[in-house]
Regions:
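Small-aliphatic-rich amphipathic alpha-helix that forms the alpha element of a beta-alpha
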Residues: 48, 70, 98, 139-150, ...
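Short coil/turn connectors at secondary-structure junctions
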Residues: 136-138, 206-207
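Bacterial N-terminal signal peptides that target proteins for export
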Residues: 1-12
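A glycine-rich helix N-cap at a beta->alpha junction
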Residues: 202-220
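N-terminal amphipathic, basic helical "cap/leader" segment at the start of enzyme domains
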Residues: 24-137
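Bacterial N-terminal signal peptides
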Residues: 10-20
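Generic beta-structure capping elements
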Residues: 33, 144-146, 217
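Solvent-exposed loop/turn segments at secondary-structure junctions
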Residues: 76-78, 105, 147-150, 218
Length: 220
């Protein structure tokens, strides 16, 4: 007959087996994005620029507060529960996903919850870009078409054009928000697509659209 102590030991062992330490996901709840203030839209357009590749090595990490604002600018809700910061065809929900590669892991931006959902604890920044400077950036955004969302309205590859157009609007918003926050970034179409597909375990019909390495400029 088990004593109370033996029962406790069995329970503890089962807990360790079923829920090992370190197995829990590390999702990140983002702070509220900045929606007011900053420079005017014409100032932001006037200063929009791509960061020089060599500068990424000296950039600092992007805070969660600033990352929150950049991601919201890219594809966040701005008018209650139905309305985004970028146009989507036929009133659809966003059909381009944004993954965030950081030193502490890789995450998927959840626009509904305005949160980062952990995909991997691995630092993959050095494996997503073809240029050496991408690996030195504190953070990289990865834009991927969402084939599951696109299939609700489009057949075959028709939706890919819409995904590319949406990614264009999203990346421009990233540029403008980043510029207002003192963040340097760069749009890059040429990425290690095959490696990214494996790292993120993408669906067969999901396509890597572009990447944007980023970091806080020195002195910002």
């Amino acid at each position: 007959m088990f004593t109370a102590f033996k029962r406790f030991c069995v329970f503890l062992l089962a807990a360790v087996v079923l829920f090992p330490v370190g197995s829990a996901s590390a999702d990140v709840s983002l702070p509220a994005p900045q929606r007011t203030g900053g420079s005017g839209v014409f100032d932001a357009l006037g200063s929009r620029a791509s960061a020089v590749g060599a500068d990424f090595a000296s950039m600092k990490d992007v805070s969660l507060e600033n990352l929150s604002t950049v991601l919201w600018a890219a594809t966040g809700l701005n008018r209650g529960e139905k309305g985004w910061t970028v146009p989507m065809a036929m009133g659809m929900e966003p059909y381009v996903k944004i993954y965030v590669a950081r030193a502490d892991g890789t995450f998927l931006y959840d626009w509904r919850a305005h949160a980062l959902k952990e995909v991997s604890k691995e630092d993959v920044r050095g494996r997503v870009g073809k240029q050496d400077f991408v690996a030195k950036a504190p953070c990289t955004l990865i834009f991927v078409s969402d084939s599951a969302a696109l299939s609700k309205k489009f057949k075959d590859d028709d939706g890919e054009e819409f995904a590319a157009v949406a990614a264009g609007a999203m990346t421009q918003n990233v540029y403008l928000a980043s510029g207002a926050l003192g963040i340097g970034t760069r749009y890059i179409r040429s990425a290690r697509d095959d490696a990214i597909e494996r790292i993120l375990s993408l669906r067969d019909d999901d396509d890597v659209l572009c990447i944007m390495p980023m970091g806080v400029k020195p002195g910002a």
